């Protein structure tokens, strides 16, 4: 046998040894489960992970990094992991990007869509406040809200009109 076959055989032996305990538990005695065989959950730290986390914190403090980010799971992510995506890209996500994002993301995550048109909402609120203030000033001064006679105004999508031409008989 050449060296590549030995490596393959060693790898297969290791895999079989690792999975043998799981196979025995599930096939021979499904009602008896070994407490050492648990599902891996990245948000739960194991003893080895805690030691590594402690060493990383000590190294970070030595470097002057004093951020307290709390317990982290696999690959340093705080769980539950949420990926935020703007609502305007929902259709793009559903068609292309979502599968790629979730396939390439190393841990389980959920995607949350947020409303990304906050600028237009703020502009609408500003316009509403301008109109409100204008009409409040007109009412306080006793001025008719249809502005003075002879003022020009425009209807959205229409030509400019003169108010005085519409104040006469109908």
Swiss-Prot record:
It is found in: Nucleus. The keyword Transcription regulation applies. Residues 143-170 are annotated as: Disordered. Keywords: Developmental protein, Nucleus, Repressor, Transcription, Transcription regulation. It comes from Xenopus tropicalis. Belongs to the ripply family. One of its GO terms (biological process) is negative regulation of transcription by RNA polymerase II. Acts as a transcriptional corepressor. Negative regulator of the transcriptional activity of tbx1 that plays a key role in pharyngeal development. Plays a role in the formation of the anteroposterior (AP) axis during embryonic development; required to establish the posterolateral border of the pre-placodal ectoderm (PPE) acting downstream of the retinoic acid receptor (RAR) signaling. GO terms for cellular component: nucleus. The gene is dscr6. Its main location: nucleus. The keyword DNA-binding does not apply. The Ripply homology domain and the WRPW motif are both necessary for its transcriptional corepressor activity on the transcription activator tbx1. The WRPW motif is required for binding to tle/groucho proteins. GO terms for molecular function: transcription coregulator activity. Residues 143-152 have a biased composition (Polar residues). Pfam families: Ripply. A motif (WRPW motif) lies at residues 40-43. InterPro entries: Ripply_fam (IPR028127). Interacts with tbx1 and tle4/grg4. This is Protein ripply3. Residues 79-114 are annotated as: Ripply homology domain.
């Amino acid at each position: 046998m050449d060296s590549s076959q030995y490596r393959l055989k060693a790898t297969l032996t290791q895999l079989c040894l690792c999975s043998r305990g799981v196979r025995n538990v599930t096939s021979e005695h499904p009602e008896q489960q070994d407490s050492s065989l648990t599902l891996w959950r990245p948000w739960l730290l194991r003893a080895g992970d805690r030691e590594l986390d402690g060493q990383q914190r000590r190294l970070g403090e030595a470097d002057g990094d004093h951020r307290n980010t709390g317990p982290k799971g696999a690959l340093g992510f705080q769980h539950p992991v949420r990926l935020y995506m703007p609502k305007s890209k929902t259709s793009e996500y559903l068609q292309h990007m979502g599968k790629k994002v979730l396939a390439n993301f190393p841990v389980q995550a959920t995607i949350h869509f947020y409303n990304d048109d906050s600028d237009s909402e703020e502009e609408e609120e500003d316009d509403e406040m301008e109109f409100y203030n204008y009409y409040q000033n007109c009412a306080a001064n006793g001025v008719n809200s249809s502005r003075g006679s002879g003022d020009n105004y425009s209807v959205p999508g229409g030509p400019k009109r003169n108010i005085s031409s519409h104040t006469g008989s109908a």
